[in-house]
Amino acid sequence: MWKRGVGALLWGMVLLRSFVAYADSQAATGGLLKEIMGEVASIRLESNMLKQQLRERHAESAALKKALQTLDVKLEKAAKALEESEHALSESKELIETLRSELEILRQRVNALNMRLRRLEITNNVLIGVAVVCGVAAIGAGIYAAVK
């Protein structure tokens, strides 16, 4: 928009100069007219340079906008990946806590089973001892009955 304004302003200056040049040309010499035409040419050259710079800035702006969009997409992907990893980490922590509590319960059960096993081994040893004593007593009773 401002490019059009600058262009219109420059053309207005050219037209103003040409009207002034026309009015002065009748009274002025040919050298003055050449000087004015040189000014017009320099203004046109400057206008063209400004237009070229404006085109270059638009190209740079478009490239920067594209780069910004690319970075924005990458940022969104990174944020989504971070959110997913945080969620996975949270789930992993919950699973670890659950496994720890289950492991503690299993340890308690193993300890209880070990205690029962020890009691059963002791009871078994006592019963084996009683059986041996009973066997010896039965053999002794059999021998006593046979001798009698």
Curated annotation (Swiss-Prot):
Subcellular location as annotated: Membrane
Main location: membrane
Keywords, sorted A to Z: Coiled coil, Membrane, Signal, Transmembrane, Transmembrane helix
Membrane topology category: Single-pass membrane protein
Coiled coil (UniProt feature): 49-129
Disulphide connectivity of cysteines: none
Signal peptide: 1-23
Name of the protein in question: Uncharacterized protein TP_0222
Species this protein is from: Treponema pallidum (strain Nichols)
